[in-house]
Amino acid sequence: MISGLLKKLFGSRNDRLIRQYSQNVRKINALEPEIAALSDEALRGKTGEFRQRLADGATLNDLLPEAFAVVREAGKRVHGMRHFDVQLIGGMVLHDGKIAEMRTGEGKTLVATLAAYLNALPGKGVHVITVNDYLASRDAEMMGRIYGFLGLTTGCNLSRMGHAEKQLAYAADITYGTNNEFGFDYLRDNMVYATGERVQRGLNFAVVDEVDSILIDEARTPLIISGQAEDHTDLYLKMNQVAPLLKRQEGGLDDKDSVIEPGDYTVDLKAHQVLLTEQGHENAEQILVRIGLLPEGAGLYEPGNILLVHHLYAALRAHALYHKDQHYVVQNGEVVIVDEFTGRLMAGRRWSDGLHQAVEAKEGVRIQAENQTLASITFQNYFRMYGKLAGMTGTADTEAFEFHHIYGLETVVIPTNRPMVRKDENDKVYRTAKEKWEAVIADIADCVKRGQPVLVGTTSIETNEYLSGLLNKAKIAHQLLNAKQHDSEAQIVAQAGRPGVVTIATNMAGRGTDIVLGGNIEKPVSQVRDDDSVPAAEKESRIAALREEWRKVHEQVIAAGGLHIIGTERHESRRIDNQLRGRSGRQGDPGSSRFYLSLEDPLMKIFAGERLNAIMVRLKMPEGEAIEHGMVTRSLESAQRKVEQRNFDIRKQLLEYDDVANDQRKVIYQQRNELLETEDISETIQAMRQGVLHDLFRTYVPVDSVEDQWDIAGLEQALASDYLLKLPLLEWVKAEPNLDDEAILKRIIDAGEEAYAAKIAQVDAAAWHQFERNVMLQSLDTHWREHLAALDHLRQGIHLRGYAQKNPKQEYKREAFELFETLLDTVRADVSKLLMTVQIRTEAQLDEAEAPPEMENVQYHHADYDEALAAAAASTAETPVQGGPKVGRNDPCPCGSGKKYKHCHGKLS
């Protein structure tokens, strides 16, 4: 009561904001005569003047009134369109990083030019994001004329474009494109191997059109790039033949006294690893030459043969460490992993690093190619990375809380330019679907008879086509519009306002194109204007005739009541229903809307079916009669609010899971960018190498252990096999009784540095540094992809922890952190091992080794929203994604450990 009284006295926050913006509108209007007096050249020169003022210390807010006045004048000169005062307010709302809710037909496309122009002046780029390629192309072409007139460049980012075209589009001052394409480009930019391959140049300011569709409906559906690595089926099969030909060494690892029978490889059960002996290296090379996998005289550790080493070790591990009916079972022609702790089958899980395929080759079952997720991100996390984010839509107010809670975006409802006079009728509720459809057909027939255009909204393509069949039976001409986007869609929608035209559309189809009463005349006018064979005087005469004919048709439609909207079912979200209603009543036009429902509709069944059915039976309502009361409409809207709240809770919970992986991706992508931008990463490689040798040493010689507990023989063998460091450790220990563990460690690290320096001395230093960087990038990418799969598996089952009285979110956070620690350790070990063992003999070999791996069958997915929501409700988990600001070296690590970033997950670099 008190809050209501205060609102009456001072107005709502929305009212107060509109009043504040109106002060600037008065300033812009005052500048109009002065700006209108400028020549075209002087008006264009304003852009350079604004940029100079910015360089001299002015802010964008200082420039706003004059910049908006300049854009308004450019709109008048280029398109004959003058921004209304309410459109100026919309532009200010966008500039302030808020959401502008503007009714359909209020000119949102034109509003975007104001904020886009102002924010493009600093030269950091502006992205204007729409829901499909058609709208992006249309808006870039139309609004690009205004920007071009003022000396700014416009780009259009479409899915079919090549790499060079995309770079050009992003280099423009203002870039139009679809949400999918901007997201995929971001992911692709984080998969490149050279900075020059990137297309985006930073995420500065985005204006999102249809912001509710993109930031709410699609916010939880990840964009996924997946692909198959090269098919190595033949290699797995051949290595499966090689493995049994190599002999396992019996007895100790390399202590000559404890070796019972020398062999080609040793098995370290403690480390779950297989290591080739010196004899094994030679024998393996001979066998590989014999079967044609290795050229005569080539070494196993040359750059071009690294893949052979990887597959050979996978085959040896499959034969020596993994046993049928203990570690796995063969079921229905597939290798299924057995959980070592519970003994349960883990269907769907696969070992990484080619091990699973090696086991499949061993068992003679079909070798399945790995289809990996290469990268993924949700729109929610992508858009939160922009320095400033703004949006426009006709229906945001119902979701204002979510926009504010998730994105920190405030929604401002912009007043209409003319009062809205559309009449929204109460819902009509029938007992059966048959009665409902009969009433819908009767209403449509009545409108056609009176010459009133009708737009019928359906919730699915199936219903769309069912109603089309009923209209065909009733011999009522109509046009069908499905959500499958095609270029003729805009043309169908544009003519949906002609007298007696019936259009059936799925609720989301055709957004972005206005339904003008009497039909859209702009296309025929443009055709006449562009016809060079017609003299100028005749052109004007034809255009005048077209406009006069349109005026008569327009008045005829207004007399019939304007556009009539029929909804055939309530959607789960009030916002979607409001979008359908909002197609009518644009710019103060008359119009009407009504929803026809039945107790057999899904939403009615869930929330109100039984109660209303009982009322209808009690009132003995005859067939074909409907309940029509405001109470029923309010009851349905209350049910919709409950569903919206449930969906919001799901999205919010999924975000909490997302943020865990989000922080990890932030670290990985930052490491990747630092690698790309650093020419010489030798210091990083050195720190990693020394760290890995230290960790290996402590595996065999634990801290604070006595000499009897040392496994010097195992350490000697591991150094020789994994790092080609052949050091007489046993002899050192025997010859020098006072040699302590720290002294041994120092000698090992010094020997590693010496061996590495000798390797670099053989080749050009710059080429070697490039090779180091590519090895690092490839390892990081490979293990990050495996990590994404591991997180996905973890997430799928984490909700079961609740049955053990554990908090699933906390468990997920803890285990995801452990997986990430393992990822970083694995990258360090792999890179160090490869660089220590690779044998470079010529510059050509180095160039060959630098080439990044090719991914085959790369696919781009964006999951269906309803599928994703259903899956989310079942598992309360989602695909991890990346976002957030850059982490400084001395900032707290985002993993939550409490350490500085450089001492925690930043230690990789």
UniProtKB/Swiss-Prot annotation:
Annotated keywords: ATP-binding, Cell inner membrane, Cell membrane, Cytoplasm, Membrane, Metal-binding, Nucleotide-binding, Protein transport, Translocase, Translocation, Transport, Zinc
Cofactor requirement: Zn(2+)
EC number(s) recorded for this UniProt protein: 7.4.2.8
Residues at which Zn(2+) binds: 893, 895, 904-905
Cofactor: binding details: May bind 1 zinc ion per subunit.
Reaction equations catalysed: ATP + H2O + cellular proteinSide 1 = ADP + phosphate + cellular proteinSide 2
GO MF assignments: ATP binding; metal ion binding; protein-exporting ATPase activity
Lipid bilayer topology: Peripheral membrane protein
GO biological process: intracellular protein transmembrane transport; protein import; protein targeting; protein transport by the Sec complex
Residues the entry annotates as binding ATP: 87, 105-109, 514
Places the protein is found: Cell inner membrane; Cytoplasm
Disordered as annotated region, ranges: 879-909
Any one annotated GO CC term: plasma membrane
Composition bias, Basic residues: 899-909
InterPro entries: Helicase_ATP-bd, Helicase_C-like, P-loop_NTPase, SEC_C_motif, SecA, SecA_CS, SecA_DEAD, SecA_motor_DEAD
Origin superkingdom: Bacteria
Function: Part of the Sec protein translocase complex. Interacts with the SecYEG preprotein conducting channel. Has a central role in coupling the hydrolysis of ATP to the transfer of proteins into and across the cell membrane, serving both as a receptor for the preprotein-SecB complex and as an ATP-driven molecular motor driving the stepwise translocation of polypeptide chains across the membrane.
Family: Belongs to the SecA family.
Assembly notes: Monomer and homodimer. Part of the essential Sec protein translocation apparatus which comprises SecA, SecYEG and auxiliary proteins SecDF-YajC and YidC.
Name of the protein: Protein translocase subunit SecA
Organism: Azoarcus sp. (strain BH72)
Gene: secA
